[in-house]
Amino acid sequence: MRFTFAEAMTDPNFYAPLAQAAEKAGYAGFTIPDSLAYPEESDAAYPYTPDGNREFLDGKAFIETFIEAAALGAVTSTIRFTPFVLKLPVRPPALVAKQASSVAYLTNNRLALGVGTSPWPEDYEFMGVDFARRGKRMDECMDIFRGLTSGEYFEFHGEFYDIPRIKMTPAPTEPIPLLV
């Protein structure tokens, strides 16, 4: 049986020693939190607290997900890193594919992606993305991600994205798992 060390909101200075200790203890995976920003005001309720309050997130330091994964990959050798949960549809999918492929390449395929839509309208607003169509956008993002991380030429023509026939390298030597 394989286990993942799930860490969410600790001081980022502790991530490297925690990842090393988790690897030494036999853990197969290590989660990395994802957050882009914290709004000063919001009408959106947090779905995982009884009262919908998310003030506990205010001031928490979240290192950019792929940078954190690359940094942790440099100080470990076997443990797999999984952003949990990467807010995929607020990001350009071609950039996510490039970032993920680069981390997978540098870490010998030790990256998986936990992806979701984000319940926060503010994440979409400040990234210039329509919140109302996030589900369909996420579907397109996953298709683009899979295609661009394949190591083959790929093109995509959808409702939100239009990508000419391109190839991204380096490509991971194994498919990057998507956990939805």
Regions from the language model: what does each represent?
Residues 1-75, 171-176:
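N-terminal beta1-alpha1-beta2 module of alpha/beta enzyme domains
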Residues 40-41, 51-54, 70, 79, ...:
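Internal, glycine-rich beta/alpha segment that forms the wall or movable "lid"
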